[in-house]
Amino acid sequence: MKFKIQYSICSLLLLTLLTSCYNQERNCTDFKTGKFTSETEIEGKKYTSTFERNDSIQIETYEGKIDTFKVRWTNDCEYIIQNTNPKNREEKKPVQMKILTTDSDSYTFEYSFVGDSKKQRGTVTKLK
């Protein structure tokens, strides 16, 4: 019995040590500016848009409609966007974006309305 407890504790410590050493590097600053395409899936339907972003403004085209958003970076990998010309109450809500992982030309992100616990995910690819 004593051996099993010691073995379990040692295994748990080893597992904790190994997982804490793995920290995937995110190069979020590479994606603060540029031209991008975004893909997200909501309830089985795929949505694609293109956008151009500088440090504080994002201009997005979705299904031929152009929207402009203010961008406020809260840290290197998180930012909040808010529509500058909302047409309804839903478009007035700011959206919190968090970059989860990065590759050389793309990143995976998570987003939600500020204060909402329901999160969605998507992928952004930087265009050349």
Question: What annotation goes with each model-predicted range?
Answer:
Residues 60, 100, 108-121:
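Short, exposed beta-strand-loop hairpins at the edges of beta-sheets
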Residues 28-44:
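Tryptophan-anchored aromatic micro-motifs
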Residues 46-74:
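N-terminal glycine/threonine-rich, aromatic-flanked beta-hairpin/loop signature
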Residues 80-104:
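An anionic, turn-rich surface loop/hairpin at beta-sheet edges
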Residues 17-20:
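C-terminal motif of bacterial Sec signal peptides marking the signal peptidase cleavage site
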Residues 22-24:
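Bacterial signal peptide processing site
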Residues 1-10:
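Bacterial N-terminal signal peptides that target proteins for export
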Residues 70-78, 99-106, 126-128:
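A short, structured loop/turn motif at beta-sheet edges
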